[in-house]
Amino acid sequence: MAMTKTKELVSSNAVVVFSKTYCPYCTSVKKLLDQLGAKYKVVELDTESDGSEIQTALAEWTGQRTVPNVFIGGKHIGGCDSTTAKHSQGQLVPLLTEAGAV
């Protein structure tokens, strides 16, 4: 059930950030996306009733259990380091543009 919900969230939103409200790395990614003017869906796993199930589904699907877990245009980007690295390499804005998020 959680896997279906997770894949549905990813396929129906240009950008999805699976996050936790208290996570500083999640905050960094959300601030970066805000600065770029990107529209994105945040799923705060610590406030969702099925958050731990979604986190387990993400781990099974992507091999990444940690947050943030970022998807752009249906593609798994990774966590904070991967997202900020894509930005410093000039790859993030084109991905966001292609996905229709900016």
From Swiss-Prot:
Disulfide bonds: 23-26
CDD domains the UniProt entry points to: GRX_GRXh_1_2_like
Pfam families: Glutaredoxin (PF00462)
Name by which UniProt lists this protein: Glutaredoxin
Primary localization: cytoplasm
Domain Glutaredoxin: 3-102
Matches recorded under InterPro entries: GLR_AS (IPR011767), Glutaredoxin (IPR002109), Glutaredoxin_euk/vir (IPR011899), Glutaredoxin_subgr (IPR014025), Thioredoxin-like_sf (IPR036249)
Any one cellular-component term (Gene Ontology): cytoplasm
Gene3D superfamilies, per database record: Glutaredoxin (3.40.30.10)
Classification via NCBIfam families: GRX_euk
Transmembrane segments: none
Summary of the function given for this chain in its UniProt record: Has a glutathione-disulfide oxidoreductase activity in the presence of NADPH and glutathione reductase. Reduces low molecular weight disulfides and proteins.
Protein location: Cytoplasm
Keywords from the UniProt entry: Cytoplasm, Disulfide bond, Electron transport, Redox-active center, Transport
